[in-house]
């Protein structure tokens, strides 16, 4: 079809030029020919059932510039059906965030093990999703920064298992995880891949244990900050605590849920520095209160900035597969700023958040936008936070998103800068936030 159109266009140009027609008339006639051709091609495509999609853009900004579609006035998840993809079929079954915000320099046949609390117990078909790229910047970006390519590495063995009720219990029901029918997988830089499906039963109160052996350089990983039990072993028998562990970016289970909820943010969303294996951070408590009918996908990462989410569409696109998305950034944009830049101004952070919310609403998500929490900042940074928080409700209003006053819950009216429950809110703060969130938005998930 395209060759025929091209040949026709060339012939028209030759004929009209010979006859002395003006370029204006030639352009008008060509526009007519191309319009008819495109209409015909579209009709043929719809009849044969074939479709095509545009390649993913390198950033959210590029994606929005290339998009010709406009968002609805309000993304109502009860009315807007998400396209069926692997991400909507295999939904998150743990509140533990397993994205990439760090890199392991080099390892040889190291076995990593993680205990993952599940949102819904029972027997499910699982699929595991991976990206060999860093999602967000860690600290000043010396070791890991947004978009950094992972190195080549090899998976020699992977399993999931029933971890019992804790690390002291025997690990049982070890089930192999394969990749294209093979136990071994060679991974290229920036490669995204999935496992084959695997079925396993996790009884009430038990952990899902992920374990795999990898070798390679520059492997993207998660820094857990004592969130759950993560260990490594050089011989597969003696496991020792490790805080940097490569994991699937989504622990996906094929389960029937009424609603899907994702959260993208920093270490406060991830739950860092809360009590070990108690899962008292606010995201976990929201998931518990909403129940297993709501799949909760935690994409919070330590040190993450809003500017990271704008720069890395892969990270942001993961949460865009979910019905509702919590957006909770600000702290690290104020403290550290954009990777390789200086600390961001309130206006710059406002711009990043605007881009994120715009992107998600265009994808059909309900967005719940948090403001920046108190951090006991001194005058300069507190001034940025105050100015930013004054701007955030307007962003929510602009896109008919929901606004959540995160800051007010974690401070007092007399001392709004003071972090009452700590810079990383403790279990008590987690309860305060979860209670208020469910009271305000619970009806969305019924």
Give names to the regions the model predicted.
Residues 3, 18-28:
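Positively charged n-region of N-terminal signal peptides that target proteins for export
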Residues 12-15, 20-22, 44-264, 269-270, ...:
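N-terminal secretory targeting modules
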Residues 26-46:
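Sec-dependent N-terminal signal peptides of Gram-positive bacterial secreted proteins and lipoproteins
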Residues 258-263, 268-354, 376-378, 386, ...:
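Conserved SGNH/GDSL esterase-like catalytic core that processes O-acyl groups on lipids
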Residues 324-330, 357, 361, 369-371:
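Conserved, well-ordered alpha-helix/loop/beta-strand core segments that scaffold catalytic motifs
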Residues 354-364, 393:
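Surface-exposed amphipathic alpha-helices with a cationic face
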Residues 363-366, 401:
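A short helix->loop->beta-strand "cap" motif at the edges of active sites that frequently abuts
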Residues 373-446:
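Catalytic His-Asp segment of secreted/periplasmic serine-dependent ester chemistry enzymes
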């Amino acid at each position: 079809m395209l060759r025929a159109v091209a040949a026709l266009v060339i012939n028209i140009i030759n004929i009209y030029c010979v006859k002395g027609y003006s370029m204006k008339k030639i352009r008008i006639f060509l526009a007519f020919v191309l319009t008819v051709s495109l209409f015909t091609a579209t009709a043929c495509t719809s009849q044969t059932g074939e479709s095509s999609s545009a390649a993913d853009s390198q950033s959210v900004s590029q994606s929005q510039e290339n998009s010709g579609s406009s968002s609805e006035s309000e993304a109502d998840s009860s009315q807007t059906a998400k396209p069926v993809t692997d991400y909507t079929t295999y939904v998150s079954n743990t509140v533990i965030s397993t994205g990439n915000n760090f890199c392991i320099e080099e390892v040889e046949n190291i076995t990593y093990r993680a205990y993952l609390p599940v949102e819904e117990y029972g027997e499910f078909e699982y699929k595991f999703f991976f990206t060999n790229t860093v999602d967000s910047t860690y600290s000043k970006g010396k070791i890991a920064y947004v978009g950094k390519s992972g190195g080549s590495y090899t998976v020699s063995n992977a399993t999931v298992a029933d971890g019992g009720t804790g690390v002291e219990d025997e690990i049982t029901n070890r089930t192999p995880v394969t990749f294209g029918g093979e136990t071994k997988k060679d991974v290229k830089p920036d490669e995204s891949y999935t496992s084959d499906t695997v079925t396993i039963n996790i009884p009430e109160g038990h952990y899902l244990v992920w374990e795999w052996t990898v070798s390679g350089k520059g492997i993207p990983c998660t820094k857990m900050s004592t969130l759950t039990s993560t260990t490594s072993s050089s011989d597969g028998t003696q496991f020792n605590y490790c805080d940097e562990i490569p994991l699937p970016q989504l622990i996906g289970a094929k389960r029937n849920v009424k609603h899907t909820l994702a959260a993208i943010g920093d270490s406060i969303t991830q739950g860092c520095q809360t009590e070990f294996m108690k899962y008292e951070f606010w995201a976990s408590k929201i998931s518990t209160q909403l129940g297993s009918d709501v799949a909760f996908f935690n994409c919070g990462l330590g040190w993450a900035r809003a500017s990271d989410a704008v720069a890395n569409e892969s990270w942001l696109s993961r949460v865009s597969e979910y019905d509702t998305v919590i957006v909770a950034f600000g702290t690290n944009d104020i403290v550290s700023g954009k990777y390789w830049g200086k600390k961001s101004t309130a206006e710059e952070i406002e711009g990043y958040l605007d881009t994120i919310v715009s992107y998600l609403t265009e994808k059909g998500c309900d967005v719940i936008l948090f403001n920046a929490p108190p951090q006991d900042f001194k005058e300069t940074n507190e001034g940025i936070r105050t100015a930013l928080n004054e701007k955030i409700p307007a962003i929510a209003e602009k896109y008919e998103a929901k606004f959540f006053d995160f800051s007010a819950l974690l401070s007092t009216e007399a001392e709004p800068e003071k972090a009452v429950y700590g810079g990383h809110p403790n279990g008590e703060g987690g309860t305060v936030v979860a209670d208020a969130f469910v009271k305000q938005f619970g009806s969305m998930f019924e």
